[in-house]
From Swiss-Prot:
Species assigned in the record: Borrelia parkeri
Keyword DNA-binding attributed: yes
Family assignment from sequence similarity: Belongs to the bacterial histone-like protein family.
GO cellular component term, pick one: cytosol
Protein name listed in UniProt: DNA-binding protein HBbu
């Protein structure tokens, strides 16, 4: 499976798709309000992670922070320079059952 040319979905694409889904349900909501909700959602996700909260969407997946140990003599791939990396946290996503099942049979 080649991952170099996968289609990319942007936040604008998500806003447009939500807008289409709402129009198909015969409701009206302007894109600017949908964008506000999507922006607020991602901001809340980020803020919750920064507070070291675990964010769980049942059957979809869980976002959490994981601690990475620091290393000595890590190499900067752009410059080749050796640097020390302190302990730090990274965002981690663990997919839920429905998401795993949904993507299991995708052929690439």
């Amino acid at each position: 499976m080649s991952f170099s040319r996968r289609p990319k979905v942007t936040k604008s694409d998500i806003v447009n798709q939500i807008s289409l889904n709402i129009k198909n349900s015969n409701e009206k909501l302007e894109k600017k309000y949908i964008r506000l909700v999507v922006d607020a959602f991602f901001e809340e996700l980020k803020n919750s992670l920064c507070l070291n909260n675990v964010i769980e969407f049942r059957s979809f997946g869980t976002f959490e922070l994981r601690k990475r140990k620091g290393r000595q003599n890590a190499r900067n791939p752009q410059t080749g320079e050796y640097v020390n990396v302190d302990d730090h946290h990274v965002a981690y996503f663990r997919p839920g059952k429905d998401l795993k099942d949904g993507v299991w049979g995708i052929k690439g």
